[in-house]
Amino acid sequence: MEAEVWEAEGYNLVLDSDLYDADGYDVPDPGLLTEKNELTFTEPSQVLPFLTSSQQWQSLTPRARARRLWLLLRTSLHEVVEKEKRAELRAARLTHGLEPLRRLEVAAGLRSVAQDPVGGRFVVLDGAGRLHLHKEDGWAQETLLAPVRLTGLVTVLGPLGAVGRFVGWGPAGLAILRPNLSLLWLSEQGVGRAPGWAPTCCLPVPDLRLLLVAEMNSSLALWQFRSGGRRLVLRGSALHPPPSPTGRLMRLAVAPVPPHHVLRCFAAYGSAVLTFDLHAWTLVDVRRDLHKTTISDLAYCEEVEAMVTASRDSTVKVWEADWQIRMVFVGHTGPVTAMTVLPNTTLVLSASQDGTLRTWDLQAAAQVGEVALGFWGQDKLSRRVGRLLAPVRPGWPVLSLCASSMQLWRVRELYSPLAQLPAKVLHVQVAPALPAPAHQSLPTRLVCACADGSVYLLSAATGRIVSSLLLEPEDCAAAVAYCLPREALWLLTRAGHLVRANAARCPMSVLHRVCPPPPPAPQPCCLHLYSHLTDLEGAFSSWEIVRQHWGELRCSSVACAWKNKNRYLPVVGHTDGTLSVLEWLSSKTVFQTEAHSPGPVVAIASTWNSIVSSGGDLTVKMWRVFPYAEESLSLLRTFSCCYPAVALCALGRRVTAGFEDPDSATYGLVQFGLGDSPRLDHRPQDDPTDHITGLCCCPTLKLYACSSLDCTVRIWTAENRLLRLLQLNGAPQALAFCSNSGDLVLALGSRLCLVSHRLYLPTSYLVKKMCRKAPDVVDDPPLPLMSQESLTSAQLQRLTNLHGAASLSEALSLIHRRRATSQHLVPKEDLDAIVARDRDLQQLRLGLVVPAAQPPPSWQQRQEGFDNYLRLIYGSGLLGMQSGRGSQQWSAGTLRVERETRDVCAVPQAAHCLARAEVSTAAQTVPTALSPQDLGALGQHFSQSPRVTVPIPPTHRRVHSKASQLLARSSLSHYLGISLDLQLQLEQLRGRTTMALDLPSSHLQCRIPLLPKRWDKEPLSSLRGFFPATVQPHKHCLRPICFPGYVPNSAVLQQMWLNAEPGASQDALWLWRPRPSQTQWQRKLLQWMGEKPGEEGEEDKKEEEEEKEDEELDWALASLSPHSNQQLDSWELEDQSAVDWTQEPRRRSCKVARTHPHPWHRHGSLLLDEHYGHLPKFLHFFIYQTWFKKLFPIFSLQAYPEAGTIEGLASLLVALLEKTTWVDRVHILQVLLRLLPNMSSDLQGQLQGLLVHLLNLDQPPSLQDQTQKKFVILALQLLLACSLESRDVVLELMSYFLYSPVHCRPELKKLLHGLGLQDPEGFLFKEMMTWVQGPDLDSKAGLRTCCHQKLEDMIQELQETPSQTSVVSGAPTRASVIPSGTSWSASGIFGRLSQVSEVPLMVVSPAEPHSLAPELQAQRMLAPKRSWGTPQLRLRVLSETLKSFCLEPEARLHPAGPAQLPGEPPPLEETDWSHSQLLDLGPIDALNFFCEQLRAQQRSSLQEKAAHPHPPEPYTVAPVPDMVVPPPREHWYHPILRLQEAKPQRSARSAMRLRGPMRSRLCAGRTLDGPIRTLKLPLPRVEPQPFPLDWPMPPRPLPPRLLQPALQRYFLPADADPDTYS
């Protein structure tokens, strides 16, 4: 065996033999130390003569001899080190993808290769029976003789291969070899062998302890490892696939099959793929003609869960789990002979007879690499690859096996993904410019300009998008400049527009746009920002000020910022060759100079004190910058060039210029130096071969980098010498150094990729980098979404797409401290209102809608608007107070209190007692006085709770006017400290009790003195009149009222509106309000419809009022002061497992009241909310649930960012539904029932399919187990709500009826009756028992399929049945019914009544007639009976149906959690959404129609039995009738066909009606599908209507007699269907 080595020493780099020789790198090492007063050898040639002189050597002492030998060794070692350095500094080419590593020749022919990752080797079996051992990199170790004659060898991985590492096969049978390749076990002669048994390939399955053996006769045998892998036992008999002329088992693969991910074996068999069940050991599937010709290889890709096949038709195909084609790779020009999948990637390698080895990316659906198989120069026959072996461990090579050789390919990844942007990236910059200081205070960001006109700021450490500027595609950037300390972004478009944006917001806002002057005036064509950054602390303080004010500096801040020493000068180049320096704020030109006239300015770059520019005059000029002067540019030096410089980069006193001349295909890099520094060039063959797309430098390492369209990145030294050539699999559009370590950021299409410095830097540079302190990584999170009104629909769509294009960054060495999380730039909820607004504007712009004049508001609308106005200011407590609309007398009377609080500690009741008041002439007393603890809690600025020494007795005094009450309850009065209750209580406590109130001085200073002259003289309780008139706004107090929207034309709100836009946290205080009770509207509706509420209604009214009061108490507790975390934790532990959250709301509230009578428990629940205030409100209900903690042990929005929205939380729970236990599934379904109204239709469809799958598993949930039974009931509710139709639920109930035991069937019948089934006799269930029998009852999925087919026949029969009157009651054609429990607004009720009364729908279930008003019940009784043939739908309110499927209170689960949480979502059946959704009950109509048919048949049979008192004995032949009786009236006008006119198809109704042997024969398929050719009767034509209309009816039924000869014209064959003649 011969080995050809293609690697270099040290870094194993592929050398370019014609690049540099070693002579150019003979630089002495300054680290070599010389010893003083010691003899040294400057040249090694002096050593040999000295040692050969024996007399002189013998004259030396042993110590001197040892010293001389040590000096010789030291000098030689230094030479070796220098040689290694020179070799490492030579130019080397690094390729992304496959690199040729080594080729091994096998003279005796290659048979098989087995990779041993445990031993770090691979074993090669040749045709002579020898085993060659090689290291993982291909170096030969030793050669052994095989213990038995073998033709193949495979490795057993995992613990199973600890004793028997290899399995071989050959003429002697199967053999197990030890790790030292000695024989451990050999199969016996004749065991498992048949004629032509010789194996062709083997595949171990260590997880199942199995071995698959493909044999020559196209059979597949299964062996099992026994005794810890020491022997094999044949399991079952060999399986033979279907015969095929070209079929032969070529390749085997094992892959998991959904949904249970059970391992199956897949075998390539000609152009088909066979699937074998390893557990049952059967052939379960055959997929034919997947390719045009023979399938040569197949493999499974776990990353995309797809099967990949390669064929000799030159294609590679990717298949879904159900063998639906996903994609086809067409690129090879010859037959594909081998294929493999790289582990833990989406990359597929394929080898073809066209001489190429190609790499395909399944995720990108494209070819990403190609290498030539003839790299080593062998002929086509010898380089034909028969097998590809993927690496078994990271760092191992890919093996391509040929007939007599083996090739090793190194898999190298030069870059890793950093971020994914929505469009192609054109420009990449780093801000602030390198080098970064050691103590980094500012974050490092990447500025990316895309082809769609957008610009993105990304964190260089994590790849997350910080902010974005969304412009149109016509504003595509020609150049960008970004100033991080000022958060300003400059953009020069290709049209010449100069745009300045505020980068402190997300999305960025355009501050101003400077349009170019009209031609022929010079146009701006180049942009650069010079940063004179000398004061890092000043830059950081300026950045913090800008971020604090969202980019808008105040005058004082601007003056302070101008005092620092940092300066930022925007420089613009024009087409006439001039350079302009712009003023920072106005973008006006403050200085202009000629630079490259008459040509345009091409490129601009800068260093710490100079600017470099190049232009069309073929010159490169360096300018000295004076940042503090008005004339800021002064020319230093001019360099003449032969070609225009398209790229510039300045580093110290040197300038690197990239030249291009496309006409002569000239592309090169040249370095210029100042003063006497020479110009540095390199060899022409080192230059790029295409357009230079980027040029940058790393000042710390003094390295340059340039990118080109020839798919290369070149690294250059400070002496302009090529150091590394990175060959990529795509053309980079831009690049930039992003750290002092030398990490590179590339733009490949729309992806940002990171090239680590460790991949290409030599050791000397790595040592230099290690000697420097790495800068600190500053956290740079994404900015929150600020402004939304100015966004267009296209920008919204881009933000929505960006929401899905999450960050792809991974944890990288040194600069990546943590793994980048998925980015959610814009929550989807923030865009709904904007998308709806923009859609309306777009329709208006296109003329699809016409604006109509708004009618004047009615009196009711004005009153409702005024109530909403007051409610917005004074809160939800105003809902229980009459406003006195008619008189508008605000102070004409006093307030009558509905109830008085009796608990002294009940803070919410005392705080909100004034909300339950009505205008009255009788004076009442005020509620119980507040305790000092409550006063301390109500004070917003109290630092701690007051200390009480004496209890306070209740006091009685007069109350203030109504307006004073309202103002006292407003948040404005509460913030300013003028709440009347608080003032009065403090007044009384000051005179009658002894207490210590620790009021901070800031709180006392901010309080508004109310009538300071009377503060110590007259108590506030004696004040009368309109109290708000005595209040004056404080000049230094912030206006606290923050509304979620804008309320125009309000004199009151103008005094309370904030200048700044309220944040999301302030909006939440207004948006989180207890929903007012809607019982009043329902009661008014019933009264309007004529029904008087009874005693039950009065009780409901009281319960609703109590529930409403509890909700108001919750709102009052929102202002209580927080307690310590220890007390919060004690309350949480105290509340564990205290309340059943699945009970009814009223019952649950009562239980909470009984369990926690002390009001501080409710205070603790609000503290829980405050403790987790950073989480969304809807998560507060789940965060303490035991099952939720079990599923998410460490829950946070950082770990689960998708849980920040209801849609994301629901999708997360749906994904966990299939993997968890039945108990957790019940909890998840209960949560999904509450979240369903806020779920999207796509997610609802996904949930519906998953539930159907779980209900029809091989082991479906059993109704005998209580937990699984709860799951079934909840799943049925979700199926109803997701689909809004009853088909799936009816099928599940029918299949469960057949599948479940007998004692479970009554409850299933009850559920079907709850859906509207009208079958008191049980006809349907008796008929269902005849559908299946025996083994068919064991599979619920099969039962569901049978029920589905029967139900479809019933529905088709219902649709085909002509209009006929049914006696089914309770099916009115028109009904205007409002179901009980529905709570709508007044306007919504009138609209729904008008809509329902006009649509012929059935809304009410017959099972609940008591929910109707008397008038509606009368209307229902008088409604006409339903005509089955009419195309009407039977609908029903969803909430009514869900109530019949609700779990009993004792059957619900009891999740552990706190006793009271404010964010509990209501049950689905109690939501407005369920009251507004209508459920389609079409399948129930079909079942009812079927039952009615059976009922009619029973009645007819009973009538016949009554007419024939002596029926014939069973099992006797009935006499043949001898008379013709008139048919029933419903068949009179149907034609009677002749015998030769039988219908070609049998209807479903006939199969239902037939009984006995005739039905069995018809069901078996023996129906009349054509003319009856066995009867030849010379009969006359049959009249369509043989009986005239006036034919008399027989007075009584006559006994059957023989047919008279005159009437013998009608016959009924035995196998005919009577219904086909009707």
From Swiss-Prot:
Transmembrane stretches, start-end: none
Region (Disordered): 1090-1112, 1453-1472
InterPro entries the UniProt entry points to: WD40/YVTN_repeat-like_dom_sf (IPR015943), WD40_repeat_CS (IPR019775), WD40_repeat_dom_sf (IPR036322), WD40_rpt (IPR001680)
Any Pfam family the entry gives: WD40
Positions of WD repeats: 187-233, 290-329, 331-370, 552-592, 594-633, 687-726
UniProt biased composition (Acidic residues): 1096-1112
Coiled-coil region(s): 1094-1118
UniProt KW keywords: Coiled coil, Repeat, WD repeat
PANTHER family in the record: WD REPEAT-CONTAINING PROTEIN 97 (PTHR45532:SF1)
Protein name: WD repeat-containing protein 97
Gene name of the record: WDR97
